[in-house]
């Protein structure tokens, strides 16, 4: 099945003589939409996740980008998108997603008037003009107001003139500030006027006093999306846009910024805007909504007409902005990494190490789930049980990963916070990004070095095992008839006394030494009392972004590394490398004492402990 921009162009050409030749099969576009919807319901080739309240929706980037300019600007930079719950709920977004993939408004349990009014608000927020026009026609046929009304009436009444003017001032001020604050920014195409259409200037809702969405349509990526723009993450003072493609959960939307009055507002308008913002009730948390059933399961056939009259052929034809040019994205240049710049608490380890090594610089930890991972909508009520305690419900992260020695040591250094992590088998990588080894398919697990052949890997592994044996022998000579507990401590102790490599970097808390500052910083995080990276799903706290990202993969079921032989998928690349040896029958790890061979390095390490144990 074709899934990509080319497929969407075929779909958009249905019945359009100006974009391409007439189709031989008039139902081709419907069949294509049917296949795409079935892929979505099964989670096949889905490369973006939309989170609304407590619900998770999987979709395809190209389908969303072809349906909405708003989504088109978001999916270029984000793979995990949070929508504003004041503007769209999970139930309404379920209907919108079904409409995008099927062209039909599926039946709902809600009455007609609130349903279409809420849909109109959400469609205007997400910039779906066809759906907004359809909702207006439905409301007009029912005789319900959607664009005008008294100031105090409920429903879809138009805001009073003072609110519309203040709204236009806020939008213009924010838009101008974004353009002026960005280096080399082009001139804006056109500023919105106070007399714009209903869905361009202000977003009507069931509660007319909710002006928070009127002054700004907040992009989940941290920018202002009311003009179809989205922010682009910048590092420090650089103004370049980071464009990350592929399913990478390292990019996470920051918290929604509060709306601040612009310079064009009068004091009365500013007070009115502030009161209306604080008076807007928060959206109720809806139960999780699973992905809808496929088009065929919902009773629709490929030959049924779509609800969108006159727009069936182009409801997915928004791949490009007017004029054939893609709209430019705007991002704040002030999105910086701030969690390392907090004021130190009196008596904390931060204050004790003021003269020592500084915290990690921005960018040294690799890509993360955000500059500062917020306690999002899913983290409310799901935090730890105590100030630094464990979450009230356990996570099942280790079900797929296993509880092997190598990964336990890596997790203990970043999550345990006890300072007794094994420094001998700790990962040396700063970020969570998996290294592309190329032809070096034979990977040493503790140090993550790749080798092109098993012979070179064996020679490298010998340096690890010989050093370990030497440590154990020295410990046995010093302790005489010491027990197994003392020898285990020798194994986990730093190997500075037995190696020729200098270790000039010393921990200011526990006096351990390391050979490079990056490893020292990673170790020092285990002494920190704060864990600034929470999981937005279960509330578990982490000291590193990379560890939290791997943890979130277990919640979302993301396994990006697939085996070409059997199709089995894994969350980590080294797991896939180990799995491939099952198909090849290769056992690259050999014991130098008895000649036994193993497919995994941790099995060899356990085997060596059997040789060196006193029993």
Curated annotation (Swiss-Prot):
Keywords: DNA-binding, Metal-binding, Nucleus, Phosphoprotein, Repeat, Repressor, Transcription, Transcription regulation, Zinc, Zinc-finger. Belongs to the krueppel C2H2-type zinc-finger protein family. Hic subfamily. SMART domains: BTB, ZnF_C2H2. Residues 336-356 have a biased composition (Basic and acidic residues). GO terms for biological process: negative regulation of DNA-templated transcription; negative regulation of transcription by RNA polymerase II; regulation of cytokine production; regulation of immune system process. Residues 144-167, 182-208, 229-421 are annotated as: Disordered. GO terms for molecular function: DNA binding; DNA-binding transcription repressor activity, RNA polymerase II-specific; RNA polymerase II cis-regulatory region sequence-specific DNA binding; zinc ion binding. This is Hypermethylated in cancer 2 protein. Gene3D superfamilies: Classic Zinc Finger, Potassium Channel Kv1.1, Chain A. It is found in: Nucleus. Self-associates. Interacts with HIC1. Residues 46-109 form the BTB domain. InterPro entries: BTB/POZ_dom, SKP1/BTB/POZ_sf, Znf_C2H2_sf, Znf_C2H2_type. Residues 246-250 are annotated as: Binding to CtBP. The keyword DNA-binding applies. It comes from the Eukaryota. The modification Phosphoserine is found at residues 166, 169, 197, 348, 412. Residues 280-296, 379-388 have a biased composition (Low complexity). It comes from Homo sapiens. Highest levels in cerebellum. Coiled coil: none annotated. GO terms for cellular component: nucleoplasm; nucleus; plasma membrane. Transcriptional repressor. A zinc finger (C2H2-type) spans 442-469, 505-532, 533-560, 561-588, 589-615. It holds the Pfam family zf-C2H2.
